[in-house]
Amino acid sequence: MPEPLTPSAQKVQDALAAQGFSYQVVESPTPSRTAAEAARLVGCQVAQIAKSLVFRMKQSGRPVLVIASGANQVNEWRIGALLKEPLEKAPAAFVREHTGFAIGGVAPLGHPKPLDTFIDQDLLKLQEIWAAAGTPNALFRLVPGDLAKMTGGRVVKVT
């Protein structure tokens, strides 16, 4: 019988089920705090890791979630231009407050309130991707097209 999931990973599993997705969260004893570590852990390419990055809008203070390919660096200016407001990197406490997760484990869903979300168009070129699931030790595999369905996010160029 598999080990029970930690509370944060279970929260993501429950959010997946609530939205009708049958994806399974898996946890490892080894944490993966970077896209490269996560890719090694699950045996995929770095580009297949969907990293969830949280930014704060400079004037309004609203959170913004960018789900990017692990191979890409997010161009904050580009996303800010889409929002018509500059962005800044969000501090750890802000990330936890608005997502319910610590940096390194931010999942694309399961947040206390919906976030403005942007999805890297490069992820949709892949057959399967992996996303964080609540902790640095938890991930789930999914079809890239489901990201927009589960997050309500806009697919854009993020680089």
Predicted regions and their residues:
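Extended, low-hydrophobicity, polar/charged segments
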Residues: 1-159
